[in-house]
Amino acid sequence: MPAIGFKYPEGDTISFQNALGDRKLDVERMGVYITALEEMAKQREPDRKPSVTELINGTCQAYLQRTEEYYIDPQEYAFSLAGTMHHRILENNASEEESEVSLEGIDITGIVDLYDSKSKILIDYKNTGSYKASQVLGMEFYLEDDPSGAVYKRSGRWGKAGTPKKVKRYFQNPEKADMGDWALQINMYRFMIESTGKQVEKMYVQMTVRDGGLVAARDRGIERNIYLAEVPKIHNDHLLDFFKEKRDRLLEALESKTVPNKCNDKETWGGIKCQRFCDVRHLCPWV
């Protein structure tokens, strides 16, 4: 039982049928036009095989999204919609055989954004914020004297009055680079491609930074709007252990109709996802 409708900003709800089928939606109240809502309303079959992206999420979240009826807030889907459009434009510029490759293996499904059979390169597109981009790139900084020669007028955190002002100089530290679950996701796509007899020499994530150019992004060392970062290879044994365990946990919960344990700290982004971003947080017994 996937999502069944939308939430208005005031909190009341309307079903997909009433909103999109019968056109009873108050567009001005919703603040989002029908064409965008139609994209947000697309659903997958609840009895489908687990997908790579689904297994990256917490098992409890995946279980509730399959078994409970819930309404979605279009405002929380804004960046997801932008990401979908971003993917679609890039896919339209790739050949049919290289873009949106559908894969299946060990009863887990996945869709690869781009596989270049000539260069044997796998690309995954991400529309992300500067915070995540800085983590992926391993951005760090050191302080140096302001090249303008400016000095502090008052003593403070960075220096005493009369001493040269300090400015941040950012650099990439490969040892600090952290792709998080992206590395697991993209490596699983690699494994699935290789299972078809094809080779993958390198993997990259191409990040389009949503807040690129803003002060917040520059304060994290993110100066560009698009970055290409190489994804390190994860050993297949570790990869399969992770995904098989997550697959079995979800399927067992669905079969027994038992709500899984609370998603772990990494899956909930330290609890932030439970507070603001999970579609089924209001249905979760652990929140």
Describe the residue ranges of each PLM region.
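Metal-dependent nuclease catalytic regions and adjoining charged, substrate-binding loops involved
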Residues: 10, 15-19, 25, 146-169, ...
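Metal-dependent nuclease catalytic cores that hydrolyze phosphodiester bonds in DNA/RNA
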Residues: 1-122, 127-164, 180, 194, ...
